[in-house]
């Protein structure tokens, strides 16, 4: 079931009548299914934050259409079941953590009893219970992020928009946030993340959308992006001094006495290689595609997309 959709969205800044415009988004289309953790990746200025703001109705589109749960962003009801953590959130400094959550709950129109129950639950979940009565002005960057995630969750949203959710949070806190996000996914919550921490995205995201210069370069699963095409690591049950495969299939390199790296000329030849090895009495213990990091795959994808505009921050 599709819960978030963008259809040919373009957003231009500047004065089109003077011919001076900057394309923040250029004909962007995507769809996000229920229960998916969907990550937006791209260099600074790629348009990730702009897309967030358009989907949430904060910015108008120049052309195109967007829908959240079937409703356009200009309809306030489209945000009724959405939670949002902006990048570098700034909350009223005079509020305490507990008062911020109460305020957020009231904005969603929640009953007082539900606000109290959810606030207490989220303060515990985000490790902020003992700071419930502390004013936000006294919070560290990581504490602001934690309470920011809590306020995004106050309405128990169906869709969660998180812009750099673990920015400023320590390693233990990052692990806790990842655990929370995985738990939310298991309950059917759709999570959309904008993050520069690709190693983090790799461990939690289902689908990745790579943006560059306002355009969608690739939408793919994390598994597809991190699988090295035409390369497989094979572990054999016994040590071999030499193994060859027909050159029209590919070549073999020993990683260890019982580990081979097979580089194929064509990925579809893997079954033929397995049959060939078995016929030559090579007993295969395991076989797995060679993996690359999401970061390496991302950098290579961006390089192939062409020269980048340089921005100091996201747009």
Model segments located where?
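ABC transporter nucleotide-binding domains
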Residues: 2-6, 11-212, 218
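Generic structural signal for individual residues within well-ordered alpha-helical segments
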Residues: 79, 101, 116, 123, ...
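Non-catalytic alpha-helical coupling and interface elements of nucleotide-dependent molecular machines
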Residues: 109, 206, 230, 303-307
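ABC transporter nucleotide-binding domain
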Residues: 178-264
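Short, charged/small-residue-rich alpha-helical element at the C-terminal edge
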Residues: 231-304
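Short, charged, intrinsically disordered terminal tails
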Residues: 306-314
């Amino acid at each position: 079931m599709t819960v978030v959709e963008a259809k040919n969205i373009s957003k231009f800044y500047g004065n089109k009548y003077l011919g001076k415009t900057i394309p923040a988004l250029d004909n962007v289309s995507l769809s996000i299914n229920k229960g998916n953790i969907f990550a937006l990746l791209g260099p600074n200025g790629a348009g990730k934050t702009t897309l967030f703001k358009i989907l949430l109705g904060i910015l108008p589109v120049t052309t195109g259409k967007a829908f959240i749960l079937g409703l356009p962003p200009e309809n306030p009801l489209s945000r009724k079941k959405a939670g949002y953590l902006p990048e570098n959130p700034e909350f009223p400094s005079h509020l305490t953590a507990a008062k911020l959550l109460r305020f957020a709950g009231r904005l969603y129109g929640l009953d007082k009893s539900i606000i109290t129950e959810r606030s207490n639950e989220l303060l515990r979940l985000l490790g902020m219970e003992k700071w419930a009565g502390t004013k936000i002005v006294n919070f560290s960057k990581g504490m602001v992020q934690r309470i920011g995630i809590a306020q995004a969750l106050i309405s128990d949203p169906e869709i969660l928009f998180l812009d750099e959710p673990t920015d400023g949070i320590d390693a233990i806190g990052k692990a806790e946030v990842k655990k929370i996000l995985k738990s939310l996914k298991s309950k059917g919550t759709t999570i959309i993340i904008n993050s520069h921490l690709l190693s983090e995205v790799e461990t939690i995201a289902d689908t990745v959308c790579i943006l560059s210069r306002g355009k969608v370069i690739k939408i793919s699963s994390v598994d597809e992006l991190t699988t090295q095409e035409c390369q497989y690591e094979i572990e054999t049950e016994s040590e071999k001094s030499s193994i060859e495969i027909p050159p029209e299939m590919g070549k073999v390199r020993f990683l260890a006495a019982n580990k081979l790296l097979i580089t194929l000329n064509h990925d579809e030849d893997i079954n033929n290689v397995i049959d060939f090895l078995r016929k030559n009495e090579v007993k295969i213990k395991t076989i797995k595609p060679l993996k690359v990091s999401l970061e390496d795959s991302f950098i290579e994808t961006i390089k192939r997309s062409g020269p980048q505009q340089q921005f100091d921050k996201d747009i």
